[in-house]
Amino acid sequence: MNQIPLLQTKDLKKHFLLERRTMFGPRDRVYAVDGINIDLNLGEILGLVGESGCGKSTLGRTILRLIEPTAGTIHFNGQDITHVKRAELKKLRSKMQIVFQDPYSSLNPRLTVLHIVGDALKAQGIAQGSEIADRVADMLNKVGIHKEKLRAFPHEFSGGQRQRIGIARALILQPKLIICDEPVSALDVSIQAQVINLLADLKTEFHLSYIMIAHDLSVVNHVSNRIAVMYLGKIIELATNRALLANPLHPYTQALISAIPVLDPDKKKKRIILKGEPPSPTNPPGGCPFHPRCWRAMGICKTDVPQWVEIEPNHYTMCYLYE
């Protein structure tokens, strides 16, 4: 019997309309998320990587209905949540949470840690009064913040500590899914591994599922079960972390992996330098979205969008090199 995915999206799209350049001219459209199909199983960590601006964060927010999808469907725990109303969406918030990228702007500077972490308990009618303080103190302890800091304000903490508070806020409702939106990119390198290891430990303790968003493949490699590579609003490759690192299929994935530093000086590898910048999401190229920068592009790549194909068991890509 096949397991029902905890999360499943089908042809999910999020397009943004921009202001008109002239009074009667057409409105440009940003194709931020452009036909995403993913599934996430209970207890799984899915890494989502790609360059800045490729649509990773928009995808995460669309899945959580923090922004409304343009088209496609979102199923969570077997339920279609694409168009559920506000009251039902509020209930779902307890099962789907997010850890934001910037620990400095994501915490309200006017609120104490008690309110930042605990207000969701009150809003969901889960706890009141002293019970909220007890639950928050316990959760802070699990993320490495002493309970004496309950009445402290965000400015009294370091960046790494603030992100731990953000993690506690996401965990306090005991969700099933947490979307980690570049959770360490704003932190010092010396702190990044600590936060990633904390998230891995909490995943085991609370039986969580993560979508781990990052622009750096090395950040998600060691904790993810599978990795999806995103480019210009589309997922262009998906595989287990081991398969992706050992045998990257798409030229863009090959370029990303070539940029990962090798610690062993005897193991040399050729760095693939991509030419130019990614095309504008307001005017994506025809055919394969990567063809303007691809050193292996063929004529068909410029005119036809490649299909999503399974090259090896559970290893998918969209590239004409494999059709």
PLM features: residue spans?
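Short catalytic/signature loops enriched in Gly
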Residues: 3-5, 18-24, 29, 238-323
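Helix-to-loop junction immediately C-terminal to a conserved catalytic motif
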Residues: 64
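Conserved ABC transporter NBD signature motif
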Residues: 72-80
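Conserved ABC ATPase "signature" region
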Residues: 80, 131-148, 201, 254-258
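Conserved ABC ATPase signature
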Residues: 153-157, 161
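A short, proline-enriched helix->beta-strand linker immediately N-terminal to the Walker B motif
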Residues: 172-176
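P-loop NTP-binding/switch modules centered on Walker-like glycine-rich loops
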Residues: 179, 183-187, 191-269
